[in-house]
Amino acid sequence: VLQIPCIPVLDPIIGALGQYLGTRGHARPGSQHVMNAEYFSRIEAMQFALTHDDGQSSWDLNEADVVLLGVSRTSKTPTCIYLANRGIKTANVPIVPGCPIPKEVFEISKPLIIGLTKDPKRLVEIRRQRLRLLDQDENTDYVNLEMVSQEINEARRLFSKHEWPVINVSRKSIEETAATIFQLYQDRLDTQF
């Protein structure tokens, strides 16, 4: 036994709050982290987002609540993780020049499909930073403004063809993008019932 003294510094505060509110506090550590249905829904959504990141496991995309499509560096993954933390099962599929989009994207009916786009100049800046961090050559179409503009235009045409809502994430935080997606998702649920 270490014989370290325990000083209950919060007891006076909890006692005063209890007196003020006319109730007694219960000494149950961890009560703020209740494992209820909402908690398990968030865990399931998080597992789904991780399993369906970057176009993986496309065979069961119809199980998603939301599917995000976008070119590289449009914040698809962090947005999915943020939404999953709110209990929304979200998958993301990249749009990569020369690589076909999984056919399942065009066959699904349940999920809300949303396109993410970004200003080409801003996208080139972000991609350049990424290449520098990875110590990669910057002489590539990945950061060529003309090619990136073409990439974004092709993505926009795809979104328009399928009448998928589009969010320009150029000047939005992950939280703002997620809030917009959540509102679109709620609107869709409201019209289904």
List each language-model region with its residue ranges.
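Long, charge-dense
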Residues: 2-42, 122-126, 130
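Hydrophobic/aromatic beta-strand patches that form the interior of the parallel beta-sheet core
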Residues: 7, 91-93, 112-116, 165-167
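A glycine- and Lys/Arg-enriched "phosphate-lid" helix/loop adjacent to the NTP-binding pocket
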Residues: 20, 110-150
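Small-molecule kinase domains that catalyze NTP-dependent phosphoryl transfer to phosphate-bearing small molecules
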Residues: 43-56, 136-177
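Internal active-site segments that recognize and position negatively charged phosphoryl groups
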Residues: 43-90
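Short beta-strand-centered segment that lines the nucleotide-binding/catalytic pocket of NTP-utilizing
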Residues: 90-101
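Short, charged, intrinsically disordered terminal tails
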Residues: 185-193
